[in-house]
Amino acid sequence: MLPSDHPMHRLADSDYLRACRGKGHERVPVWFQRQAGRSLPEYHAIRGAGSILKTLRDPEVSAEITLQPVRRYGVDAAILYSDIVVPAECIGFGVDVVPGVGPVIEQPFRTTSDLERLRPLDPESDTAHVLKTVEILVDELTIPLIGFAGAPFTLASYLIEGRPSRDYANTKSLMLNDPGLWHQLMDRLTDLAVASIRSQVMAGASAVQLFDSWAG
């Protein structure tokens, strides 16, 4: 149950949230995938060089980057500036996002012993900076904020491959040759995603999305 002062209540009649619920709306609401980020000159001015994960640890900067496309384009929803590997990085799995490459894993997931490296997420301590970013945003926004997490298959593909891949050979091999371990990994990553998006909603996000880039 959401608290009575949750932003979703005051924004319930926005075109975006009405569309999310399958209700009628005055016009088609619009937001853009990756609207916060590389396409905006003001993003590059504030972002600087280095890993995105360093930027994401600063709630004020992350909130500002989230707000930039809202000011520029007048979109109907803001999407949190973050990355799907953040929860895994925050529980100590050894993840970085290398400019020009993408997520790179220090020690890729390979065996049953690697499950021990995927402990449960405690959002209040592990991703406190993410929740602070959400809180800053909902105080400023007059439109819904979308939170998100990586869906289990896509996050697993990064953790197993160790970096972006063209054929996901290691992922397919694990699925086919050790289905028991694969399902245990899916369970751990499902719990990780649920804990992450639930905490974002409780912090003030009005909608959430799972990104599953490699499932298709």
Enumerate the predicted regions with their spans:
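N-terminal basic, low-complexity leaders that serve as flexible interaction/assembly modules and, when applicable
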Residues: 1-95, 99
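Glycine-rich, aromatic-flanked loop segments that form ligand/cofactor-binding clefts
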Residues: 19-35, 75-105, 124-167
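Glycine-rich tight-turn/loop motif centered on a GG-T
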Residues: 49-55, 94-105, 113-124, 160-186, ...
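Glycine-rich anion/phosphate-binding loops
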Residues: 51-75, 120-138, 180-195
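Short, intrinsically disordered/low-complexity patches at protein termini
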Residues: 65, 103, 206-207
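Membrane-interfacial amphipathic helices and adjacent loop/beta segments
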Residues: 109
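Active-site loop segments of alpha/beta catalytic cores
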Residues: 128-216
